[in-house]
Amino acid sequence: RVTSHVALRDVSGLLTPEGVADAAKLITDSLLAAGKTEPRVAVCGLNPHNGDNGNYGNEESTVIEPGIALARSRGCAVDGPFPADTIFVRAKNGQYDGIVTMYHDQGQIAMKLMGFERGVTVQGGLPIPVTTPAHGTAYDIAGRGIANVGAMKNAFDLACRMAAGRHTRS
């Protein structure tokens, strides 16, 4: 995502073309590290219906599109911006390998709905692979014998693939 854990009211002011391009590069590099040879990345718009030609905001044309152009100039295969309410379906159907979102919940809600028990969060841009189950720590069920280990196993497996990929490329 372009912004981190910030209030929704602050997101628009924190978006920059450079931030969009950096996020696209980060997800591209993370997908390469995970073994995708030609990652395809989509970028979400910020506003409903991508701003509907400025009726609901103009960040898509003033910030996000220039960021996409910058990402392409850096070698990223990136498309968008797309409305957030439809792009995740296209990714789930295999058209895209990763999605750049503008803020935290824009991506987390979709990811958790598509696979709460399987989802993995990757902390990209670090010298070593860092992955965690997307659902978080689950302290509320710790020690009760009811946890599903699927997301933790996927996080571990992905970290191993990323480490192996970094080893073979260096």
Language-model segments: which ranges?
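Anion-binding alpha/beta catalytic cores of soluble intermediary-metabolism enzymes, centered on
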Residues: 1-59, 65-170
